[in-house]
């Protein structure tokens, strides 16, 4: 009898430990899709799209659940009436919130909050510069000197934007956000700046395909 009680207790503890193991839950809302429409979870790996999971929309919402060993850049994708939406984020254990529409928003975990903040800042800066450029080019009342001054102001803002990019990468070079952003923006930095960032990459990311390619490029 005592042995049976012991075995039941051990089994209960094992079940609890299993249930408490790290997992992710992606809770999303989506605009423009009907009940039963399919949304895909995919990873872009070695030049190919790899389907990880799929789910259907119900009441404008969808959910993905599972477990993830390391934070990985993935995509939530759907197509409807010839329109395609693709939102990238970090699939990692934790509660991830997703809002898909004209402007995709993803957060809820440390990497995704940081990544979304970076995107918001970069998009806002880019929009401001584009608006300034279009306005200067379309305003027939401006003199050449005035247009030149606008272009100089845009160059200053561009420099500020790239400083923001560099600082974000540097601050996150030990996590998935920095590792994702560095290869994407490295070409915008001087070689010595690229090297300074690469030297700070932890060993756990040393074999990342994009990082390996970047290192080879820097060395040549």
Where are these regions (language model features)?
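Amphipathic alpha-helical coiled-coil segments
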Residues: 155-172, 192-196
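Bacterial Sec-dependent N-terminal signal peptides
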Residues: 1-29
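A non-transmembrane, solvent-exposed segment enriched in polar/low-complexity residues
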Residues: 18-163
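Short, structured interface segments
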Residues: 97-99, 104, 167, 208-219
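N-proximal helix/coil linker or "cap" segments that precede and/or mark the start of modular domains
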Residues: 192-220
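Amphipathic alpha-helical repeat scaffolds of TPR domains
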Residues: 130, 174-184
């Amino acid at each position: 009898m005592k042995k049976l009680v012991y075995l039941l207790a051990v089994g209960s503890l094992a079940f609890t430990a299993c249930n408490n193991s790290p997992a992710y839950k992606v809770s999303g809302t989506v605009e423009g899709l009907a009940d039963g429409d399919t949304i895909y979870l995919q990873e872009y790996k070695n030049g190919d799209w790899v389907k990880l999971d799929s789910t259907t929309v119900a009441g404008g919402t969808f959910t993905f659940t599972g477990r993830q060993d390391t934070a990985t850049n993935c995509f939530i994708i759907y197509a409807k009436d010839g329109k395609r939406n693709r939102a990238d984020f970090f699939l990692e254990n934790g509660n991830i919130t997703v809002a898909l529409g004209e402007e995709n928003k993803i957060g809820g975990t440390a990497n995704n909050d940081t990544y979304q903040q970076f995107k918001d800042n970069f998009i806002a800066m880019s929009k401001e510069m584009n608006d300034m450029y279009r306005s200067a080019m379309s305003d027939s009342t401006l003199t050449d000197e005035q247009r030149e001054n606008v272009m100089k102001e845009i160059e200053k803002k561009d420099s500020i934007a790239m400083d923001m990019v560099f600082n974000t990468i540097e601050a996150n070079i030990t996590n998935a956000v920095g590792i994702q952003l560095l290869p994407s923006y490295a070409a915008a930095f001087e070689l010595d700046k690229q090297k300074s960032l690469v030297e700070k990459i932890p060993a756990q990311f040393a074999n990342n395909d994009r990082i390996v390619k970047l290192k080879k490029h820097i060395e040549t």
